Amino acid sequence: MNDRAAAFADSRQQHNRQDSAGMQEYVLQARGITKAFVQGGFNVQVLNNTELTVRRGEKLAVVGASGSGKSTLLHVLGGLDEPSAGEVSLLGKPFTQLAERERNELRNRALGFVYQFHHLLPEFTALDNVAMPLRIRRMTTEDAREQAQAMLERVGLGPRAKHRPGELSGGERQRVAIARALVTKPACVLADEPTGNLDGTTADTVFNLMLELSETLETSFVIVTHDPDLAARCDRIMRLRDGVLHEEPALPV
């Protein structure tokens, strides 16, 4: 009886360890997310009790019609907008329930953002744009620039570090934006149409870079895109329709 009890206890401990490991694999989780706005006196529901999970190193594409709420979803996932109901967890912490200061600290530590338009500071060099998130963390200028230079090398722009955004091509500016998003080594990057403002060849190059960095840095990506070919190259595709995310079947690349 004692042997059986010991075996049972050992089995339960192993099961609990597996559950704990499984929880740690999820860098981002959303449960029951609802978001509504009041427009013209009418209540407009954009997200309706939707769910999402993102594993470490996973590349998730979010597709859907224009105006379906994809950008709103990213804002809620990133803690930039409050959901009307539901909860977002980031690295196992209840992101949406944290005080503003704690939420900002966790966002700066664990999330990166890339947008359709690069939003680089025009008066700063590529190097100082990439170093900015590290300076916000109160890292010394020397250390921040050293890490920023290393990340610019990773995206193939080491020789362009001293150039300002106006001296770079569209694809180069977007690569600087990706370097800025990744320089803090975030667990997850939220990307809103990151190639939407680029021509086809440049978009493909930038997307390849994102996929490569996701693999080498074990960084998760949630990528909103209208391009079905790019979406098909992600690990999973979810379609936002009527405020709810639906898993799409895997497509051949």
UniProtKB/Swiss-Prot annotation:
Pfam families: ABC_tran
Membrane topology per record: Peripheral membrane protein
Cysteine disulfide links: none
Single GO MF annotation: transmembrane transporter activity
CDD domains per the UniProt record, alphabetical: ABC_MJ0796_LolCDE_FtsE (cd03255)
Principal place of residence: membrane
GO cellular component assignments: plasma membrane
Keywords annotated in UniProt: ATP-binding, Cell inner membrane, Cell membrane, Membrane, Nucleotide-binding, Translocase, Transport
Gene Ontology BP annotations: lipoprotein localization to outer membrane; protein localization to outer membrane
Binding site for ATP: G64, A65, S66, G67, S68, G69, K70, S71
Quaternary state and interactors: The complex is composed of two ATP-binding proteins (LolD) and two transmembrane proteins (LolC and LolE).
Family from the record: Belongs to the ABC transporter superfamily. Lipoprotein translocase (TC 3.A.1.125) family.
PANTHER family: IMPORT ATP-BINDING PROTEIN, LIPOPROTEIN-RELEASING SYSTEM ATP-BINDING PROTEIN LOLD
Function: Part of the ABC transporter complex LolCDE involved in the translocation of mature outer membrane-directed lipoproteins, from the inner membrane to the periplasmic chaperone, LolA. Responsible for the formation of the LolA-lipoprotein complex in an ATP-dependent manner.
Name of the protein: Lipoprotein-releasing system ATP-binding protein LolD
